[in-house]
């Protein structure tokens, strides 16, 4: 799993690539949390899932956990460009009612 992040103005973009599953989630969580903490002045966090090749319920839990953390900082969170497979998992879970898709 690869995590890349960059801040542009008041927006923190987080790009995830690979599989979000039980084996990778702890490393991904640490990297994303560190990026959020380093950019605590951002107003929005946009998580790009275009290159996520696999995601199960562990990925949903990961996103909800990041959403809660981001809320504590007073930021908004959005999901961007989920691929077809990730989009199906997220839509069925109902997560888009909590974290809007761009």
Language model segments and positions:
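Short leucine-rich amphipathic alpha-helices used at interfaces
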Residues: 2-3, 37
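Absolute protein N-terminus
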Residues: 1-2, 102
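STAS-typified acidic loop motif
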Residues: 4-30
């Amino acid at each position: 799993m690869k995590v890349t992040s960059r801040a542009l103005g008041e927006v923190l973009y987080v790009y995830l690539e690979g599989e979000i599953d039980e084996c990778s989630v702890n490393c991904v969580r640490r990297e994303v949390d560190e990026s959020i903490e380093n950019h605590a002045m951002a107003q929005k966090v946009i998580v790009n899932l275009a290159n996520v090749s696999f995601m199960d319920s562990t990925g949903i839990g990961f996103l909800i956990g990041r959403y809660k953390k981001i809320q504590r900082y007073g930021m908004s969170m959005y999901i961007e460009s989920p691929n077809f497979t990730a989009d199906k998992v997220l839509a069925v879970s109902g997560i888009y009612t909590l974290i809007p898709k761009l």
